[in-house]
A protein has these predicted regions:
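ABC ATPase C-loop
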Residues: 148-149
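The feature captures the beta-strand-to-loop junction immediately N-terminal to the Walker
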Residues: 33-35
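Helix-to-loop junction immediately C-terminal to a conserved catalytic motif
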Residues: 48
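ABC ATPase NBD coupling module
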Residues: 52, 64-85, 107-114, 126-129, ...
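ABC-type ATPase nucleotide-binding domains, specifically the catalytic core motifs of the NBD
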Residues: 12, 68, 93-112, 120-122, ...
Length: 261
């Protein structure tokens, strides 16, 4: 469904992604993991059209969308929930949600789609007139995901959906992602916590300093000795940040476990 081939992203002279390739099949939940600055958000921004790759190709449903404008990618069924939610703080919950249905083809079905979103997030039903900035972090995340669902996507990307949430809310958001997937929407999300992410995802990719370091099914990654030793540590810690420095060799180069070309 989604393929990224040899992607390179630059911000001026800074190389954020180098030669990154991945594939997400229809119906999957796939997690993109890595420490802060590893390139996770840059990859998602390139897929949704918020940044233009310096090299490489992005295809969606077999069509090359590398240079397609963001709004047209949305119309094709590709939605993106940005890191830190990015709601309109002084607009109501309802107003924020309805903005997700601005694509002309979705407007006639706004009422029906809004009802389906409120069924998925019942806590928002009685808060539709509440200003977004007065919501808790978990409620704001519900609004951000609901706004993306208003476009009726077939593929949704969530950038760090657990950021700043309590353990209880992390579980709730994870369950929501499974429900979205069960409804026929393919899911790609980013996260730093490995065990937590792989308990939700079918497969995962790990980025290190803008390059692909590891990939495999959730079971394969959890059983991988390099991942256990470098990223998770002997105590089973889940944060990739803890192992980021150890994942570099003596010369500072990232340790990668990929098949040679």
């Amino acid at each position: 469904m989604l393929s990224v081939e040899a992607l390179e992203v630059r911000y001026g002279g800074y190389l954020a992604l180098s030669d990154v390739s991945l594939h997400v099949a229809a119906g999957e939940i796939v997690c993109l993991m890595g420490a802060n600055g590893s390139g996770k958000s840059s990859l998602m921004n390139a897929v949704s059209g918020l940044v233009t790759p310096a090299a490489g190709r992005v295809t969606f449903d077999g069509a090359d969308i590398t240079t397609v404008p963001t709004y047209r990618r949305l119309a094709r069924g590709l939605a993106h929930v940005l890191e830190r939610r990015r709601l309109f703080s002084y607009m109501t919950v309802r107003e924020n949600l309805l903005l997700g249905a601005y694509v002309s083809a979705m407007r006639p079905a706004r009422a029906e789609t809004l009802e389906s979103v409120l069924v998925m997030f019942p806590a928002l039903r009685d808060r539709q007139s509440q200003l977004a900035h007065t919501l808790s972090g978990g409620e704001q995340q519900m609004v951000a995901i609901g706004r993306a669902l208003m476009s009726r996507p077939r593929f949704i990307m969530l950038d760090e959906p657990f950021l700043g949430l309590s353990p209880r809310l992390v579980i709730q958001v994870g369950e929501t992602m499974r429900r979205i997937n069960a409804a026929g929407v393919t899911v790609l999300f980013t996260e730093q916590a490995i065990q937590q992410s792989l308990s939700i995802a079918d497969r995962g990719y790990i980025l290190e300093s803008g390059r692909l370091a590891l990939t495999g099914t959730s079971a394969e990654l959890l059983a991988n000795e390099l991942l256990q030793r470098v990223y998770m540590g002997l105590d089973g810690a889940t944060a990739i940040d803890d192992g980021a420095d150890a994942a570099r060799g003596a010369d500072g180069a990232a340790v990668e476990e990929k098949e040679p070309r």
